[in-house]
């Protein structure tokens, strides 16, 4: 039986910058550094874990060649993080603003996705589109 998504790895142009960004933006919501593993090319993969046991992680690894990320090229479109409340969405947005991220959508309702869907969208340092959202009817 499929249980969910275990982890997603993002290849970053500057892994230390990306670690600092994600820890600054999502650290206040519980994302933390779980472990560092060696990748198949000898690179370090930094896994930032979600706070609930068994809920997965996001891996950040150093790129070996420069290549600009394109949102609509084959591959990743965006990564969405689920949070408990609208206040958590607002916290992530404030962290993204403080980190200098390009904001795509400030926190707001997206009823086309779900009646209670509330989200913010921004770009990480490599241009990956990040979404932080809740579908719970809480503040």
Give residue ranges: language-model regions.
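Vicinal oxygen chelate
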Residues: 12-17, 79-125
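Short glycine-enriched loop/turn motifs at secondary-structure junctions
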Residues: 2-4, 72-76, 114
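N-terminal beta-strand motif that seeds the catalytic metal site of vicinal oxygen chelate
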Residues: 1-19, 79, 136-139
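Conserved Rossmann-like nucleotide-cofactor binding loop
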Residues: 128
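Short glycine-/small-residue motifs
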Residues: 57, 131-132
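Long, continuous compositionally biased terminal/linker segments
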Residues: 43-84, 91
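Core segments of cupin and vicinal oxygen chelate
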Residues: 9-56
């Amino acid at each position: 039986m499929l249980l969910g998504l275990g982890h997603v790895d993002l290849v970053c142009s500057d892994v230390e910058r990306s670690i600092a960004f994600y820890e600054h933006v999502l650290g206040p919501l519980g994302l933390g550094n779980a472990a560092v593993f060696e990748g198949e090319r000898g690179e370090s993969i930094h896994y930032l874990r979600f706070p609930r046991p068994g809920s997965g992680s996001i891996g950040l690894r150093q790129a070996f060649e420069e290549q600009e990320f394109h949102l609509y090229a084959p591959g990743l479109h965006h990564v969405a993080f689920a949070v408990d409340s609208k206040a958590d969405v607002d916290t992530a947005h404030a962290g993204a603003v403080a980190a200098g991220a390009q904001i795509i959508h400030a926190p707001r309702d997206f009823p086309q996705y779900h009646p209670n869907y509330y989200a913010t969208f921004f770009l990480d340092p490599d241009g990956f589109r990040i979404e932080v959202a809740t579908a719970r009817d809480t503040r």
